[in-house]
Design a protein with these regions (language model features):
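Enriched for short, Lys/Arg-rich terminal
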Residues: 70-99
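GIY-YIG nuclease signature motif recognition
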Residues: 12, 39, 76
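Structural signal for well-ordered, non-membrane alpha-helices
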Residues: 20, 40-47
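Basic/aromatic recognition patch in beta-strand/loop cores that engages polyanionic ligands
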Residues: 49-81
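Short, hydrophobic secondary-structure boundary micro-motifs
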Residues: 32, 54-56, 97
Length: 99
């Protein structure tokens, strides 16, 4: 297995900002920061043994989907030297329609 560079697209970064804002309103700044840090650490962990999750070629060629803590869905593709994270969906978002 090889390590790959992690790339978060602007849409994924915007998703993380939205998740932060949503949690910050409900639970406060510290809770929101800690949650985002856990999501980011999980995404960075896709650098090794990257070819995991469910393949969803029906939505986009090479697309993979993984869940995080039962509330977050991460969509990404694995390339030869990098993992490209497209979106990070929170809660019950209808992520299939967003891709």
């Amino acid at each position: 297995m090889k390590r790959r560079h992690i790339v978060l697209l602007p849409e994924a970064l915007a998703d993380l900002r939205w998740i932060y804002d949503t949690i910050e309103i409900a639970a406060g700044n510290v809770t929101a920061i800690r949650y985002i840090e856990r999501i980011e650490a999980y995404c960075q962990g896709l650098d090794y043994a990257s070819e995991r999750g469910t393949r969803r070629d029906d939505l986009r060629p090479g697309l993979r989907v993984v869940g995080f803590e039962r509330r977050v869905t991460v969509t990404f593709t694995v390339e030869s030297d990098q993992v490209v994270i497209f979106r990070v969906f929170y809660g019950g978002a209808n992520w299939e329609d967003e891709l």
